[in-house]
């Protein structure tokens, strides 16, 4: 049986599978996709802690449900940074960063 990490968020508890990152570090696989109860509760709690904002920004794809729910609850819009440039982007802004869960660098792109 896989080792787990117990997560307590927004009054809810989840058991997360621990995934070996390297010989010195594990990460807990926290996948909110499909967990509507946790997404709604976490969005509400995060909004209580957020300073005033005009827009939410999330990375494609796992952050989308949380950003969507935070947008729904707050009435503020959200934008998804895509993993690559798209044909419809007229003035893309590109950043690259090293991801701990994806081998190599990860590109994130938004249109101005």
Question: Where do the PLM segments sit?
Answer:
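Short, catalytically relevant binding-site loops at active-site mouths
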Residues: 62-65, 85-87
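Short Gly/Thr/Asp-enriched flexible loops that form oxyanion-binding sites at enzyme active sites
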Residues: 65-74
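Short glycine-rich phosphate-binding loop at a beta-alpha junction
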Residues: 53-60
């Amino acid at each position: 049986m896989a080792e787990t990490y117990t997560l307590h968020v927004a009054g809810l508890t989840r058991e997360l599978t621990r995934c070996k990152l390297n010989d010195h570090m594990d990460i807990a696989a926290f996948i909110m996709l499909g967990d509507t109860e946790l997404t709604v509760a976490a969005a509400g709690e995060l909004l209580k802690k957020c300073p005033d904002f005009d827009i939410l920004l999330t990375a494609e794809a796992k952050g989308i449900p949380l950003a969507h729910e935070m947008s729904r609850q707050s009435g503020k819009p959200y934008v998804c940074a895509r993993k690559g440039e798209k044909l419809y982007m007229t003035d893309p802004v590109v950043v690259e960063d090293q991801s701990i869960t994806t081998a190599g660098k990860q590109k994130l792109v938004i249109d101005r």
